């Protein structure tokens, strides 16, 4: 069995990380995430036991920190273990989950298992994970550890024949806006944040042990070859209709976000017009006071007492737009695969006799 000694020098444990936190680069960028096959199997098992539920759990592993003396160096992340988070009702206290996670990591540490929290995972059907809750949880993880990522597992897309496991992290621009809690239109525009740059996708590499790689050819030889043809199924009505339905719901949500912004714009225009009218009346009143030799009234008082409408947060619209973009990509990719199946099916059919 391969020893983990080489990784002890390359990666740092939590205790070592606390000792070198002062030397860490302020904005460590993760360019590669390595996930053990055991972690993938645990995530899949958790999702299968709770179908159509956004199950979650913490990721444990090791981190290679970026050297502060080398600004161009990137951080590397290795996910070696995970465990599911228990389901709680809305009436339960959130501290129950936190206490459970802390206790689990303490037990793992006692048995010499990697116990450093390097992120979290979530199961999301059809890629429905771009929401404010996911962004807020990821912000809390990256605030405590800049290299943290969220692994998104899609069980529906996986059933189509390809494992759907992606890693995401909040961009530096999004982290800055989250830290100041300012997602108003002006702040978003000045930061240059778009729906494409809220989350950054990080490449994922799945690592299997040497014994598992040796076992794969043996399992492949015993595989029922008839199951391979299930991928050629042309009946894609259920998948496509569900994707289109989610796409329409996303467009409705985006329309609501646009209506909120338009309502704010109208209220802001009315408020500005009201302030301009009050200032104009105050100037006319001051002219009369000057003519009588009386002291003028301050215009700054009107400006200070004037209430302007609060601009709406643009985070919701950015995430909804990113979600719509994901649905469009899924429809495009699946349509391309379906056309390929149709051409293959046509080529295998005997030509009709004239």
Swiss-Prot record:
Keyword Cytoplasm among UniProt keywords: yes
Function: Component of the eukaryotic translation initiation factor 3 (eIF-3) complex, which is involved in protein synthesis of a specialized repertoire of mRNAs and, together with other initiation factors, stimulates binding of mRNA and methionyl-tRNAi to the 40S ribosome. The eIF-3 complex specifically targets and initiates translation of a subset of mRNAs involved in cell proliferation.
Protein name in UniProt: Eukaryotic translation initiation factor 3 subunit H
Keywords: Cytoplasm, Initiation factor, Protein biosynthesis
CDD domains per record: MPN_eIF3h (cd08065)
GO MF entry, a single one: metallopeptidase activity
InterPro entries linked: eIF3h, eIF3h_C, JAMM/MPN+_dom, JAMM_MPN+_peptidase_M67A, MPN
GO biological process per UniProt: formation of cytoplasmic translation initiation complex; translational initiation
Region feature Disordered, mapped onto this chain: 1-28
PROSITE patterns found in the cross-reference section: MPN
Taxonomic path: Eukaryota, Choanoflagellata, Craspedida, Salpingoecidae, Monosiga
Annotated compartments: Cytoplasm
Bias-annotated ranges (Polar residues): 19-28
UniProt GO cellular component terms: eukaryotic 43S preinitiation complex; eukaryotic 48S preinitiation complex; eukaryotic translation initiation factor 3 complex
SMART domains: JAB_MPN (SM00232)
Family recorded in the similarity comment: Belongs to the eIF-3 subunit H family.
Primary localization: cytoplasm
Cytoplasm is among the record's keywords: yes
Subunit comment: Component of the eukaryotic translation initiation factor 3 (eIF-3) complex.
Residue ranges occupied by any MPN domain in the UniProt entry: 33-174
PANTHER family (UniProt xref): EUKARYOTIC TRANSLATION INITIATION FACTOR 3 -RELATED
């Amino acid at each position: 069995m391969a020893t983990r000694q080489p990784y002890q020098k390359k990666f740092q444990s939590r205790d070592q990380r606390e000792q070198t936190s002062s030397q860490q680069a302020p904005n460590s960028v993760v360019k590669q995430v390595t996930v053990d096959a055991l972690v993938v199997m645990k995530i899949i098992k958790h999702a299968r036991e709770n179908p159509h539920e956004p199950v979650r759990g913490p990721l444990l592993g090791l981190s290679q920190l970026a050297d502060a003396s080398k600004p161009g160096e990137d951080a590397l992340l290795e996910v070696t273990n995970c465990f599911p988070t228990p389901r709680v009702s809305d009436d339960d206290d959130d501290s129950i989950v936190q206490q459970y996670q802390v206790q689990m990591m303490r037990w793992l540490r006692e048995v010499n298992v990697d116990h450093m929290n390097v992120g979290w995972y979530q199961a999301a059907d059809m890629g429905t994970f771009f929401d404010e809750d996911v962004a807020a949880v990821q912000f809390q993880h990256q605030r405590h550890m800049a290299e943290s990522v969220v692994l998104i597992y899609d069980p529906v897309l996986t059933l189509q024949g390809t494992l759907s496991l992606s890693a995401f992290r909040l961009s530096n621009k999004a982290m800055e806006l989250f830290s100041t809690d300012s997602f108003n239109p002006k702040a978003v525009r000045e930061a240059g944040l778009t729906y494409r740059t809220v989350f950054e996708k990080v490449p994922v590499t799945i690592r299997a042990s040497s014994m598992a790689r040796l076992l794969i050819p043996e399992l492949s030889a015993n595989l029922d070859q008839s199951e391979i043809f299930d991928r050629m199924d042309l009946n894609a009505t259920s998948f496509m209709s569900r994707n289109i339905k989610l796409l329409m719901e996303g467009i409705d949500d985006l329309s609501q976000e646009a209506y909120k912004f338009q309502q704010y714009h109208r209220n802001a225009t009315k408020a500005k017009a009201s302030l301009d009218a009050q200032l104009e009346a105050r100037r006319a009143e001051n002219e009369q006071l000057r003519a009588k030799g009386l002291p003028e009234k301050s215009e700054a008082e009107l400006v200070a007492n004037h209430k302007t409408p609060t601009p709406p947060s643009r985070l919701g619209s950015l995430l909804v737009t990113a979600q719509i973009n994901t649905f469009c990509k899924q429809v495009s990719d699946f349509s391309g695969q379906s056309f390929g199946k149709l051409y293959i099916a046509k080529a295998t059919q005997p030509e009709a006799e004239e």
